[in-house]
Amino acid sequence: GVEGAELVELSAEDLEPIFHPDDALESDAPLLRAVGEDNLVCHHKVRRGDAEAALEHAHLIIEKEFHTGWFEHAYMEPEGSVCFPRQDGTLEIYGSLQHPVSTRRFIAAWLAMPYSLLEVFNHPVGGSFGGKDDTASAVAGRAALAALGVGRPVKIIYEREWSFRESYKRPPYRMRYRVGFGSAGEMEAAVIDILADSGAYTSTVPWSTWRSAAQCCGPYRVPAVRADVRAAATNNVFTGAFRGFGSPQVNFAVESLMDEAAERLGLTALEIRRKNMLHQGDATITGQVLDDHTVSLDQVMRAVTEEIGFEEKVGQCSMGHPREDGTLYGIGFAISYRGASVGAEAKDFCSCVVNCQFDGSILMETGIHENGQGAQSAMILAMADVLGVSMERIHYAESTTSQVPEGGTTVASRGTLMGTGAVVDAADKVKAIIADTLTEKLGGKGEDVMFADDRVFVGTGDHSWDMSWDEAMAVMYEQRVYPFAFGSFKAPEVSWDDETGRGSPYFTYVYSAQAAELVVDAERGSVSVTQVVAAHDSGRVVNPPLFEGQIAGGIVQGMGMALSEDLKVESGRILAGNYNAYKIPKSIDAPNITVLRVENSDPLSPYGSKGIGEPALELIAPAIANALYRATGRRSGTLPLTPKGSVGPWGSVEKDKS
């Protein structure tokens, strides 16, 4: 046989590469992008008051530079796809895909085929963390192209080295902060400049950096802000979506800076946050007034610090002086707020289909994709709750792009929030159909019909009746009225002005706090995180075990970002090809984790829920950084918090030893 690669002829012209984002933005830099007049991928702004003037009158100004590098998603299942050509010309596509609808859109553009001839199947994915979008769709597109060409099924499964080399990474950030404080510790102004490396292609960096801009000052009141968040194209590995999506980087900077400011102002870490954190009715840096949901920063911070005993233990920190056993002890915490859903990036929506069967079983499908986060379980729980039936009746069908309308991609911790919104709408519609049909036959009013405990009944008035769910379905089919409904949920309106960075970028927020205790071996320098306490207000918790699992997983994944994961890139080439050269946390590295639920049902969410996948990860790095400072007496502005190591395209950065 002939190897496919032997049939490919390559013609390429050597050009001068650019590996540093600053160099890419020089006026005489060669153009690296297919669109645009320069290498500036995006520029997001926040303008509030006169920040420079306010800094001139500040009692204390802290000026710091922070760096984060490239990070690999490290999903267990590599990219892969199988494509079957059908006799009718349709291509049937399976794969490790994060968003089948966008995969269909990409393949349709590549192959110049109509959507109707591309059916992409929605299967659970063996890990994604934001990484199974662009690259995974490209793999599916190659399988589709080959299948179309040879007229036979084609399977492509990536080896780990291929996955490392081709997949996009978390974008490296250089963050320059100048923040002014009053004598009592109140934040007065912030001037922020952030530069991200988008790499050789533009993926989702324009949107992740937008979130960074909207949340660049953390969950605090700052009356004067000038923030510029930019991304540049380079010849490095391309970057894109990763769990946290622009928040972990700025949270690391802000929460590290807040602890340092507290120390220099003679305040405790708790006091400076209480003075500055957002409360009910406060305005954010973008001018959004938080008055339509519960602002619970003080609740989550109090829950975490009391549970871990922060105020009692902070005085026991080593500050560079080893204990008798040769170890250094430290404790730290961090808080955050995170906009739920995709916000003003795009109009967010989701869909659901519910189809009640003659035998009492129920089929349901949604536009939410299962990436291992437990989305299907959450949808089933919500449907069972609204219909008043047992979960065992409900079968969550793995849909295709031909069966359920677009429901948005599984990103931005939007699955539970948007998915349950569509589920509630579909369930309410099918309940109305059932109620109207049964009352027409048995008497009563539709609004008086109750659904609970696998029964449908009217318990008051002259026309009371009671029947099992199975009996109700039999009546529905006798009447030839089909208990089927399509539901949808569209996120409430949001707003954003690109020139000023003003508006309401998200319709609601998740509030979070995490605290960490750690021990450092003073001789070897190794760090062991021993205890983590996490409190998150993500609205109504649909599935408590999965809620806790998401948080535990996010914490351990975030520990890798904080302490060990250092993806080295040389002249645009990734040096690691497997996990022997890229150190992710192991099970033995996991600390004791205590999860505290702070539940304030969200009035703008049909089911009262928000999301937890990304808030779980975005705080542990600054909590560890603050704990590490109290252990060693040295503060680092880089991630990972290793004594040596590269920091993305900026190379080796001198560690701050202040």
Regions found by a protein language model. Give the residues of each.
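Structural alpha/beta core scaffold segments of enzyme domains
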Residues: 1-535, 629-632, 645, 649-654
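Amphipathic, heptad-repeat alpha-helical segments used for oligomerization and assembly
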Residues: 245, 410, 414, 598-616
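Active-site "cap" helix and flanking loop/linker of ATP-utilizing ligase/carboxylase catalytic domains
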Residues: 304, 545, 549-581
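C-terminal substrate/ligand-recognition segments
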Residues: 376, 515, 520, 560-565, ...
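Cytochrome P450 core scaffold surrounding the K-helix E-X-X-R motif
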Residues: 539-543
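Membrane-interface anchoring segments and C-terminal beta-barrel signals
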Residues: 640-642, 658
